[in-house]
Design a protein with these regions (language model features):
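Amphipathic alpha-helical coiled-coil/heptad-repeat segments
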Residues: 171, 208-253
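Polybasic, glycine- and aromatic-enriched phosphate-binding surface used to engage nucleic acids
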Residues: 1-214, 234-236
Length: 253
């Protein structure tokens, strides 16, 4: 699309503008690695509160109470099970099923690891959560209490206010980028995967004037959608005609 190409020539991609895109943890055996606090009978430091797509389906965080086993130390190395008797007992109890996973076959010594390495500090990092398959962007702010499941993508930033970033990633501009690159599924659903999210272009916050930064922060906290739309249009220097052409109902027609 012509407008998308113009934006690509004018703005950096998300990860060049102070943001990081990632995906939550895949375990290979959710029935064993995921459960309630009481069901995962391991040491407190060997489990993390887990957030899933179901927990944000209403547009806000409504935690379902699940945890995920964390077989990694803070430095990224696998734990020594002998240091955690409850954890060792739990994985030994489920050893047969855990070892059937492909990741266990490739890592005999680390047979109890999750498919993806867990970085526990992500739990306490404020982030935006985005489900994989949606008809439109579903971007939820999580203020730093949960670790994301593998069906959720996350965006963090040290330069952008996350409420502002949420406003931008929920806008028709972000939708246009996803629609331009994602395969379209039945029912006009799109894939909001990391590879497509990374294609989204945004301004660098530090390049905005002080007055525009202030207005942007105010608009992001407004309950008026028209105010948010007008601000995003200004951030991208879009004409009224270009803005109208990005209407999702037109893009999906």
């Amino acid at each position: 699309m012509e407008i998308v190409r113009k934006l690509e020539a004018s703005f950096p991609v998300l990860e060049e503008a102070g943001c990081k895109v990632g995906i939550g943890v895949a375990t290979g055996a959710d029935a064993i690695f995921i459960g309630s606090d009481a069901r995962l009978e391991v040491e407190p430091e060997r489990k993390l509160p887990l957030i899933t797509t179901k927990d944000i389906r209403n547009g806000r965080v409504e935690w379902g109470g699940n945890f995920v086993l964390n077989p990694f130390e803070a430095d990224g190395s696998l734990v020594d099970p002998d240091k955690y008797p409850k954890f060792r007992a739990y994985i030994e109890r489920h050893r047969e099923l855990i070892q059937k996973r492909n990741v266990a076959g490739r890592n005999p010594k680390g047979w109890f690891r999750t498919i993806d390495r867990i970085h526990a500090n992500l739990t306490n990092t404020p982030k935006l959560l985005i489900p994989d398959i949606k008809g439109s962007a579903h971007v939820v702010l999580e203020t730093g209490h949960y670790y994301p499941h593998h069906n959720l993508y996350f965006v963090t930033s040290e330069t952008w206010d996350l409420k502002v970033l949420q406003m931008i990633l929920s806008s028709r501009v972000a939708h246009a980028f996803i629609a331009a690159y994602s395969p379209r599924l039945r029912g006009n659903f799109l894939r909001f995967q990391a590879q497509y999210l990374r294609r989204i272009r945004i301004p660098r916050f530090e390049n905005l004037s002080k007055s525009l930064q202030k207005e942007t922060l105010a608009a992001a906290r407004s309950s008026h959608q028209g105010e948010k739309d007008a601000l995003v249009q200004r951030l991208y220097n879009l004409t009224d005609l270009d803005w109208s052409r990005l209407d999702p109902s037109i893009l999906t027609a």
